């Protein structure tokens, strides 16, 4: 009897987990994109600030931002699935939502493969899981093609600037270092013990990067690096580039666009065409 009871309990839990989610809330921009990629777009009823892709996401009610989440409003919306960013959304507020019995799915992509895996996992909540499977498989195929293409390329040293004041960069193992690594880049601060270290201008100059990358949030073309003319290879060779921030910093299918952009720039640096 005990075996039968356990079997019924496990089977019931499995069945519930596979039921399509009808009311979904996303608490970060990247989980919003992943939801659409997994076929959950029609089920989304609210999202976080800066959830701006695809265009349909811009019409969703806002229930989260960098300061936290609107707990009372989220509960009132009665979601059957909440998509959260592990490490990005406040743990205490997430715990409260779980204590209230709400179903919270945590996304925390670390490797490029994690994007495809997360899409497949979210697809289990979609009425059309085949969309998630197809999207994930296509992503894996494109990643595999880039790996094959770049495996014998010359390594290019680079510095990626997240912000101007203070100067923040990324270490190996932190998103989006995987994109640069796939394209044959060597992070000059890859060995930092901090995931997102704060560095000085002098530290960057000492490590002599061939390329400096920034985003529109850190306008490297007209910033401090131009003051180091003659001392920085990246500046002397005009290898200071601005990348599309959302492609690069959000772990979503659009990461492929970031890979194409970064790999293309590295190729031109290697070939001497820039």
UniProtKB/Swiss-Prot annotation:
Main site of residence?
Answer: periplasm
PROSITE patterns (UniProt xref): FE_B12_PBP
Q: Which GO terms describe its biological process?
A: cellular response to iron ion; cobalamin transport
Q: Where is the signal peptide?
A: 1-17
Superkingdom of source = Bacteria
Q: Name one GO molecular function term.
A: cobalamin binding
Q: What is this protein called?
A: Vitamin B12-binding protein
State the organism named in the record: Photobacterium profundum (strain SS9)
């Amino acid at each position: 009897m005990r075996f039968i009871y356990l079997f019924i309990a496990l089977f019931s839990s499995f069945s519930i987990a596979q039921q399509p989610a009808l009311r979904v809330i996303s608490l970060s921009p990247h989980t919003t994109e992943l939801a659409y990629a997994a076929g959950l777009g029609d089920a989304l009823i609210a999202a976080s600030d800066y959830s701006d892709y695809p265009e349909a996401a811009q019409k969703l009610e806002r229930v989260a931002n960098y300061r936290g989440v609107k707990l009372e409003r989220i509960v009132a919306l009665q979601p059957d699935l909440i998509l959260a960013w592990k490490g990005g959304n406040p743990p205490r507020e997430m715990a409260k939502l779980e204590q209230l019995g709400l179903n919270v799915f945590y996304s925390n992509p670390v490797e490029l493969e994690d994007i495809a895996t997360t899409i497949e996992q979210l697809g289990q909540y979609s009425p059309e899981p085949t969309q998630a499977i197809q999207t994930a498989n296509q992503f894996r195929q494109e990643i595999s093609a880039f790996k094959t293409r770049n495996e014998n390329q010359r390594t290019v040293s680079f510095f990626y600037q997240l912000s101007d004041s203070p100067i923040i960069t990324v270490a190996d193992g932190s998103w989006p270092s995987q994109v640069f690594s796939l394209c044959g880049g060597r992070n000059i601060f890859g060995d930092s013990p901090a995931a997102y270290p704060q560095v000085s201008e002098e530290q960057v100059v000492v490590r002599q990067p061939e390329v400096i990358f920034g985003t529109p949030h850190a306008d490297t073309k007209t910033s401090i690096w131009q003051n180091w003319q003659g001392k920085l290879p990246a500046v002397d060779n005009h290898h200071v580039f601005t990348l599309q921030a959302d492609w690069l910093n959000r772990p979503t299918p659009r990461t492929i666009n970031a890979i194409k952009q970064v790999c293309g720039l590295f190729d031109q640096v290697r070939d001497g065409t820039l």
